């Protein structure tokens, strides 16, 4: 099943309640699906939006909507630090973080190669945690911020 930003829970707009044009958002996994839709929705609400993904060639289409493409690999600390620093240098703030980058390796546990399982945890768990660690201090300093973590049924054991 595919879900779009329009199908998000009704409470979600409250998280994006800043006045138009006053917020800065970072959306990971913005090259397709929920991440891409979320980036467009935030932009329509007036946010300055940075759409992050490993494959920046797929992000170029977002620029027509005013979304700023950002090369970021959530398994690479230097890549995440560089991306966060760029946003802070250009705007001075990050008001919303949408952790949407994800990777799925499916199958019975005995059939999934352990390297694939590790990669999935690196992207879906440790990447999310590290990017959140990089951004929380800036949100704390400002006294506000919103972090949204997107997951999947794949996280259910």
Model-based region annotation:
Residues 86-99, 105:
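A glycine-rich helix->loop->beta "capping" turn
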């Amino acid at each position: 099943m595919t879900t779009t930003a329009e199908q998000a829970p009704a409470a979600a707009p409250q998280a994006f309640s800043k006045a138009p044009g006053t917020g800065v958002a970072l959306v990971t996994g913005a090259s397709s699906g929920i991440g891409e839709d979320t980036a467009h929705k935030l932009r329509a609400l007036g946010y300055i939006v940075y759409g992050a993904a490993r494959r920046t060639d797929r992000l170029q289409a977002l620029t027509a909507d005013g979304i700023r493409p950002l090369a970021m690999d959530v398994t690479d600390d230097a890549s995440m630090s560089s991306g966060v620093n760029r946003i802070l240098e250009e705007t001075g703030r990050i008001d919303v973080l949408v952790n949407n980058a994800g990777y799925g390796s499916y199958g019975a546990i005995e059939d999934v190669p352990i390297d694939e399982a590790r990669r999935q945890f690196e992207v879906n768990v440790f990447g999310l945690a590290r990017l959140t660690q990089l951004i929380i201090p800036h949100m704390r300093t400002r006294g506000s911020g919103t972090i949204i973590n997107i997951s999947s049924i794949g996280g259910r054991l």
